[in-house]
């Protein structure tokens, strides 16, 4: 009979081959959202106009969603022409395509700094409006009103501060998830949170933007002070999430 304990010990004693492991990491790499690749594709397809086009795509993502063909059905003639041009120029897809394809949501997430700034202007055109959020927590921070905000969160903040920011952001995600997914409307807070916690944490812990730059963004947004302490509005939203149903 095999001695499985001994086999496990012998296996652990084998030398670690760094090159072999790195090769496997490349082979098994997640073929989904990659902010660097998104920006690379934007520049490749858009040339000198990529930044202006990206701004348009962010507005579309925030106000109309991730399905450009469907949104064109109810849009002005000028708007349809603009969206059609973007679809053709950037080969925009819907759903969850390969790593080397663009969607409106991916553009908004990759350029989260710009997306969060646009939210201040567009908050009343979102699926869950700023007015609605103010009803849940006074002066709810507009910069937090999109899933891409998680990419701006500095994970090196002190634990209590980090938790408060994530809870405040989760207050929006809770409402947003129930609006865009009817199947979640009768679910508990914990059940709904289970659908957005993993992608939120993945964005927080990504290495695309440094901790220092993220902290600068949070300060510029008025969400934390020079010590990383959350603002009163953030703390109020965090408390509202804790007591939300």
Curated annotation (Swiss-Prot):
Coiled coil: none annotated. Its main location: virion. RNA binds at residues 30, 33, 66-67, 70, 99, 105-106, 185, 195. Residues 1-71 are annotated as: Essential for oligomerization. InterPro entries: Capsid_Phlebovir/Tenuivir, Nucleocapsid_Phlebovirus. The record marks 125 as: Important for dimerization. Changing residue 125 to A: Almost complete loss of transcription. GO terms for molecular function: identical protein binding; RNA binding. One of its GO terms (cellular component) is host cell nucleus. It holds the Pfam family Tenui_N. Keywords: Capsid protein, Host cytoplasm, Host Golgi apparatus, Host nucleus, Ribonucleoprotein, RNA-binding, Viral nucleoprotein, Virion. The keyword Ribonucleoprotein applies. It is found in: Virion; Host cytoplasm; Host nucleus; Host endoplasmic reticulum-Golgi intermediate compartment. Encapsidates the genomic RNA, protecting it from nucleases. Displays high affinity for single-stranded nucleic acid. The encapsidated genomic RNA is termed the nucleocapsid (NC) or ribonucleoprotein. The ribonucleoprotein has a non-helical structure. Serves as template for viral transcription and replication. After replication, the nucleocapsid is recruited to the host Golgi apparatus by glycoprotein Gn for packaging into virus particles. The N-terminus is involved in homooligomerization. Homodimer. Homohexamer; ring-shaped, necessary to form the nucleocapsid. Homopentamers; opened pentamers in solution. Binds to viral genomic RNA. Interacts with glycoprotein Gn; this interaction allows packaging of nucleocapsids into virions. Belongs to the phlebovirus nucleocapsid protein family. This is Nucleoprotein. It comes from Rift valley fever virus.
